[in-house]
């Protein structure tokens, strides 16, 4: 009777920033003959392209919202219930290792794995480690980060940390093979406006006004592809219709990697996944970090790309139609600068991260190369 290949359980929060790196690692592990499953919350089913429903286990979890006794009790109850379910999963599936990618849905499976002595690893894509991963960091077997130096201030954590980069989905790797072509003097200028997998209202508030300020000389050149929440769709469409723009609006783009590859300039939030994908593909960007985050992780993420020369970072308080119009106008008049930004961003990217992380996972799980080929 042929032995089954080892199972690697991947745990990720239900947004694209957590899920897409898990998908990329899943592809790399499956190519090595390993089995994979995903533990997450219900949101992930919308974004996942790799994991079919029968490869996904949904466990209850709760993001901590507020410090009131009621909020704390609700979070504790949900996470406790999720951990009991995760313990049952560990008993039934017996994974060789459990790998977390951040977000509160990773807590139950990682804690359950630790209770059973199953090897564990967390991967963090941010320049500042997220709260769930930080909570788990002292408990897990190993840590992987996208950027160097994230945990240098804690020698105990630094000793078990490996810098791998952010794993990229096959669609991103395909988009990275498309070279950047600067816009011609009178040719189309392709703008891509996104706000993360959950959208961003600030883009609907600011971008239409900025484009209107660019004036009629530039409007005919613009090709605007914008992610817009359903509740903001009508007002954004009304502005672009009035300006007679060439535009496309959607609440979510399933083919975002191809859209990134086709763009001359990306206007976006600066979640870790977005920044890593922009660097991998090499596209100029204007990044607007999400304000109010406890750790200012998006501000730090955007700083990595802006310091490399691949992006312009604008704090949300400064992100006005006038400021954005000035930046777009200056870039539209200077194609050579767009080319330089694309090259600088690409220089900050890493395309082999999924394989590097897969190497680490196999090592942590104690899987031999011979064992990993079992089906």
Curated annotation (Swiss-Prot):
Query: Where does it reside?
Result: Cell inner membrane
Q: Where does UDP-N-acetyl-alpha-D-glucosamine bind?
A: 15-17, 126, 169, 197, 298
**From the UniProt record, which GO molecular function terms apply?**
UDP-N-acetyl-D-glucosamine:N-acetylmuramoyl-L-alanyl-D-glutamyl-meso-2,6-diaminopimelyl-D-alanyl-D-alanine-diphosphoundecaprenol 4-beta-N-acetylglucosaminlytransferase activity; undecaprenyldiphospho-muramoylpentapeptide beta-N-acetylglucosaminyltransferase activity
UniProt catalytic activity: di-trans,octa-cis-undecaprenyl diphospho-N-acetyl-alpha-D-muramoyl-L-alanyl-D-glutamyl-meso-2,6-diaminopimeloyl-D-alanyl-D-alanine + UDP-N-acetyl-alpha-D-glucosamine = di-trans,octa-cis-undecaprenyl diphospho-[N-acetyl-alpha-D-glucosaminyl-(1->4)]-N-acetyl-alpha-D-muramoyl-L-alanyl-D-glutamyl-meso-2,6-diaminopimeloyl-D-alanyl-D-alanine + UDP + H(+)
Q: Name one Pfam family in it.
A: Glyco_transf_28
| Signal peptide annotation | none
Name the GO cellular-component terms: plasma membrane
Family matches, as SUPFAM superfamilies: UDP-Glycosyltransferase/glycogen phosphorylase
Q: How is this protein positioned relative to the membrane?
A: Peripheral membrane protein
* EC assignment: 2.4.1.227
Q: Which GO terms describe its biological process?
A: carbohydrate metabolic process; cell division; cell wall organization; lipid glycosylation; peptidoglycan biosynthetic process; regulation of cell shape
User: What sections of the protein cross the membrane?
Assistant: none
InterPro entries on file: GlcNAc_MurG, Glyco_trans_28_C, GlycoTrans_28_N
Give, as in the UniProt entry, the pathway in which the protein acts.
Cell wall biogenesis; peptidoglycan biosynthesis
Principal localization reads membrane
Class of enzymatic activity (EC top level): transferase
Keywords recorded for this protein, A-Z: Cell cycle, Cell division, Cell inner membrane, Cell membrane, Cell shape, Cell wall biogenesis/degradation, Glycosyltransferase, Membrane, Peptidoglycan synthesis, Transferase
Say which family it is in. Belongs to the glycosyltransferase 28 family. MurG subfamily.
What's this chain's function?
Cell wall formation. Catalyzes the transfer of a GlcNAc subunit on undecaprenyl-pyrophosphoryl-MurNAc-pentapeptide (lipid intermediate I) to form undecaprenyl-pyrophosphoryl-MurNAc-(pentapeptide)GlcNAc (lipid intermediate II).
Which HAMAP family does the record cross-reference, listed alphabetically?
MurG
Q: What is this protein called?
A: UDP-N-acetylglucosamine--N-acetylmuramyl-(pentapeptide) pyrophosphoryl-undecaprenol N-acetylglucosamine transferase
Gene name, Swiss-Prot/TrEMBL:
murG
């Amino acid at each position: 009777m042929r032995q089954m290949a080892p199972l690697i359980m991947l745990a990720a929060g239900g947004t694209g920033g957590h899920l897409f790196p898990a998908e990329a690692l899943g592809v790399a592990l499956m190519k090595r003959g390993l089995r994979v499953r995903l533990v997450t919350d219900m949101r992930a089913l919308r974004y996942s392209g790799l994991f079919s429903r029968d490869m996904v286990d949904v466990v209850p979890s709760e993001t901590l919202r507020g410090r009131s006794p009621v909020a704390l009790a609700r979070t504790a109850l949900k996470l406790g219930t999720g951990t009991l379910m995760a313990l049952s999963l560990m008993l039934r599936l017996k994974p060789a290792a459990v790998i977390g990618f951040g977000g509160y849905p990773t807590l139950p499976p990682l804690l359950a794995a630790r209770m059973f002595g199953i090897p564990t690893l967390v991967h963090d894509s941010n320049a500042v480690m997220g709260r769930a991963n930080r909570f788990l960091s002292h408990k897990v077997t190993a840590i992987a980060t996208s950027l160097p130096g994230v945990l240098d201030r804690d020698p105990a954590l630094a000793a078990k940390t490996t810098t791998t980069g952010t794993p990229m989905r096959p669609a991103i790797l395909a988009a990275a093979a498309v070279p950047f072509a600067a816009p011609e003097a009178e040719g189309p200028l392709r703008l891509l406006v996104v706000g993360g997998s959950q959208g961003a209202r600030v883009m609907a508030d600011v971008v239409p006004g900025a484009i209107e300020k660019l004036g009629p000389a530039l409007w005919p050149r613009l090709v605007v592809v914008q992610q817009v929440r359903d509740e903001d769709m009508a007002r954004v469409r009304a502005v672009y219709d009035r300006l007679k723009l060439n535009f496309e609006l959607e609440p979510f783009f399933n083919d975002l990697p191809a859209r990134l590859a086709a763009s001359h300039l990306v206007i976006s939030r600066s979640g870790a996944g977005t920044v890593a994908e922009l660097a991998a593909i090499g596209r100029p960007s204007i990044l607007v970090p999400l304000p109010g985050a406890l750790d200012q992780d998006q501000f730090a993420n955007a700083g990595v790309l802006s310091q490399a020369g691949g992006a312009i970072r604008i704090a949300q308080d400064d992100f006005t139609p006038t400021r954005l119009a000035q930046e777009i106008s200056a870039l539209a008049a200077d194609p050579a600068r767009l080319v330089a930004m694309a090259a600088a961003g690409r220089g900050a990217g890493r395309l082999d991260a999924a394989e590097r992380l897969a190497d680490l996972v196999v090592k942590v799980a104690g899987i031999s190369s011979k064992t990993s080929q079992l089906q």
